[in-house]
Amino acid sequence: PGQIEKSAVNLVAFAKTAVLEPEQSQELTLTFDLYDMASYDSYDMNKNGASTYELDKGKYSIKVMNNAHELNECENAEIEFEIASNLNYKLDPKTKQIVKNRFTGDTAYAGVPIDGSTAGSKIEYLSRGNFGETFPVDATPNRSGAEVSKANSYVYNGYENNERYTTAPKQGQNYGDEHLRLWTRADGSPATTSDLQGTGGVELKLNEELVEKLGRNYKAPEWEQLLNEITEAELYYLVECSGYSNAEMVSIGKAKNYDYDGPSGLQANAGTPDGVDKGKWTGFGGQMNLAQTFNIELAFSMGRTIGNEAQATGISGWYAPGVNLHRTPYNGRYFEYYSEDTVLSGWLGAYVIKGSLSANVYCYLKHFALSEMGQNPTRLNVWVTEQALRETYLRPFEIAVKEGGANGVMTAFNRIGGTW
């Protein structure tokens, strides 16, 4: 009572030895931050006026374990320490951004809390503090068709006085002689649509100086100008017509790139460049097989191998890895995801991404977020507390972005709470 609800055991770090012969040993170093042990207090359960990542005061144990239940037999396998007063993370230790509730209460995104507190009926969440009273016994009956139709027709009207949503940026701006282009023809003239699609039969030249500036600093002024130059029609086309590719943009000299599925290796679907021999792509086992190895070096090798195959066959982006969690046996996409553990999933995904990026192939981390319910769960409302969202379902994505350098994300089909 008076503290944030938390599990008894959490994985914070893991490592794997080489193959050891009898009498051989190996020293392993495990590192983590106190932030990795923190709980998210979405409802201010410890009454300190903060809703952020926190460590409650009290005793903690760091254990070297073989699994979630079995302590390792090594020396000093358990170390206890005490935190004298609550530790709050007002800023994210890596990004330095403010940490606060974004999906709970009156300040929730789009005005719709994801915990269902404004949905008109109480949602009882399972609690470790009271399994008997909170464990569901009877299935919740389906709502009537009229109720579902009413819910589906809901429109959020809170955008009217928000400049962020009501003022569209001016697109298609022309900067004359200072106009920025990623690719031009070899003579410096603007590339055409067919040129950027690779069918124009002309040699193109990359603006290496511009690309280096853009890649070095996301706050570079060149980014603002480049985005201003893109036409509105090109933006729509990029969003609406980019399955297994991302479209060319004549306004900025962006070439068409091909992107491909999936987490177990490039899949032989339609849409690859002409002349690609898909039969030479490698099919890997399900991702839970990789997870069972606890081997981040192997994850890196897998990512690099697929990245090399992609580069050799004209593929620039990869729809992978998938870091959704195993929550039920009845999901036909679990071969694409690693495990039920957030930290294991996040770190394996991070190293797969590192491997792919080392071969100059970018990744689309997926499926963001809460897509644990099956085959592309469309029109599904997933109700969850912000604590569970952050600690469980978003954590693998957080690790993969912060530690793996993911620079692409594939969104899910479901709603989070009542918001899509």
Task: Describe the residue ranges of each PLM region.
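Short beta-strand elements
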Residues: 70-100
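Glycoside hydrolase catalytic-domain context in secreted enzymes
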Residues: 1-49, 53-64, 68-70, 105-106, ...
